[in-house]
């Protein structure tokens, strides 16, 4: 937990889930710069009396600081939502002060102030601006914020194409602001997302089926090479086993398990609302008739009963925004051990340099290498 002092007040903030030894803060200079801009006497304070929409607030720092203005927070991240609720409570703020919407929810009809934390994915930025543009009017104040290394010419072009004329601020503490002036004359076009592609011929049971990808999921325009390698080495199971695609992305791992064993009961889990929507559409498009599946947006396997799962398939992320970390993978591995029955198995694909085998041996007491190439390795751990 750390203290965030702004012109709106001082707040105690933490990421979610909170880890006592987590070196990363729940806010950064880009959040601070944006909040300063809203009260800058040089440009005149921004009128926050109308509908304020905060998009992509990573850990609730912006929503918490602006809670007095009853903002709408729009996020693709379940963990960001939980962080926001926890940070509001931590600072004695009623959770009803912030209206929480997911990236898949219908946005407000009218937005008077649109504050955008620039995401890593330009596709996600494009999709969200397309969805929000109908609510923007000629008087809407539109401000984006991000670290300098997150904002590129391509970022500005997206704002300009969808919202209107766009300029940037000077950099302050390696953060920069984006100012867009809404142009009502711009044509209102639909988002090009989701994107669909046919799975290649060398990936086992799902070859030739369709993957559906909403904006913002990892490697949304093609099958990522780690998943492609994993698909060639997935375990085979028969009967009414329960299989979880953990951190499912577009769901092709779980789909492969369902196609290979139509009697299996699949559960797709991700903390991204867009990912779970992608997985559900991928499954509906390619699964055998009668195949059974659940789709959960959540914090790993926390919502599953302990000892209820036979097989977990996992391609864990190793980035948290711009930071490289194995914390998410370790949390997923520990959650998988809890969710698995005795004799149940966790299968993982990862880059060789991440050394996931050390974490699996520590958590499960065992780890076997199933397959590998110069870049990737498929690992198997069994709950004893």
UniProtKB/Swiss-Prot annotation:
Pfam families: MTS
Catalysed reaction equations from the record: guanosine(1835) in 23S rRNA + S-adenosyl-L-methionine = N(2)-methylguanosine(1835) in 23S rRNA + S-adenosyl-L-homocysteine + H(+)
Compartment(s) of residence: Cytoplasm
Entry EC number(s): 2.1.1.174
Keyword Chaperone set for record: no
Classification via SUPFAM superfamilies: S-adenosyl-L-methionine-dependent methyltransferases
GO cellular-component term (any): cytoplasm
A single GO molecular function term of this UniProt record: nucleic acid binding
Keyword S-adenosyl-L-methionine belongs to the record: yes
InterPro entries for the chain: DNA_methylase_N6_adenine_CS, rRNA_m2G-MeTrfase_RlmG, RsmC/RlmG, SAM-dependent_MTases_sf, Small_mtfrase_dom
Main function: Specifically methylates the guanine in position 1835 (m2G1835) of 23S rRNA.
Protein name: Ribosomal RNA large subunit methyltransferase G
Species the sequence originates in: Streptomyces griseus subsp. griseus (strain JCM 4626 / CBS 651.72 / NBRC 13350 / KCC S-0626 / ISP 5235)
Gene from which the chain derives: rlmG
């Amino acid at each position: 937990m750390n203290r965030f002092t702004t012109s709106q007040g001082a707040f105690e903030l933490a990421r979610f889930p909170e880890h006592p030894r987590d070196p990363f803060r729940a806010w950064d200079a880009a959040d601070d710069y944006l909040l300063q801009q809203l009260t800058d006497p040089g440009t005149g304070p921004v009128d926050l009396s109308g509908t304020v929409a905060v998009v992509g607030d990573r850990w609730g720092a912006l929503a918490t600081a602006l809670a007095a203005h009853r903002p709408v927070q729009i996020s693709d991240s379940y963990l960001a939502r939980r962080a926001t609720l926890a940070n509001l409570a931590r600072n004695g703020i009623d959770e009803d002060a912030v209206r929480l919407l997911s990236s898949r929810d219908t946005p407000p009809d009218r937005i008077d102030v649109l504050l955008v934390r620039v995401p890593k994915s330009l596709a996600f930025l494009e999709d969200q601006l397309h969805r929000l543009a109908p609510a923007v009017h000629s008087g809407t104040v539109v401000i984006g914020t991000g670290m300098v290394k997150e904002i590129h010419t391509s970022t500005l072009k997206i704002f300009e194409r969808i919202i209107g004329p766009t300029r940037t601020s000077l950099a302050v503490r390696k953060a920069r602001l984006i100012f867009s002036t809404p142009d009502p004359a711009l044509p209102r076009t639909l988002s090009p997302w989701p994107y669909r592609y046919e799975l290649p011929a060398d990936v086992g049971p799902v070859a030739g089926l369709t993957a559906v990808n909403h904006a913002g999921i990892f490697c949304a325009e093609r099958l990522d090479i780690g998943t492609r390698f994993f698909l060639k080495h997935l375990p085979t199971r028969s009967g009414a086993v329960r299989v979880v695609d953990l951190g499912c992305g577009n769901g092709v791992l779980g789909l492969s398990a369902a196609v290979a064993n139509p009697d299996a009961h699949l559960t797709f889990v991700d903390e991204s609302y867009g990912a779970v929507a992608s997985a559900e559409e991928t499954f509906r498009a390619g699964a055998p008739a009668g195949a059974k599946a659940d789709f959960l947006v959540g914090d790993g396997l926390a919502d599953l009963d302990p000892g209820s799962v036979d097989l977990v398939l996992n391609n864990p992320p190793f980035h948290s925004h711009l930071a490289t970390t194995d914390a998410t993978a370790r949390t997923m591995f520990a959650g998988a051990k809890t969710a698995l029955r005795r004799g149940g198995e966790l299968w993982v694909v990862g880059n060789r340099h991440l050394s996931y085998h050390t974490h699996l041996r520590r958590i499960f007491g065992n780890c076997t290498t199933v397959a590998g190439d110069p870049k990737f390795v498929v690992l198997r751990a069994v709950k004893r």
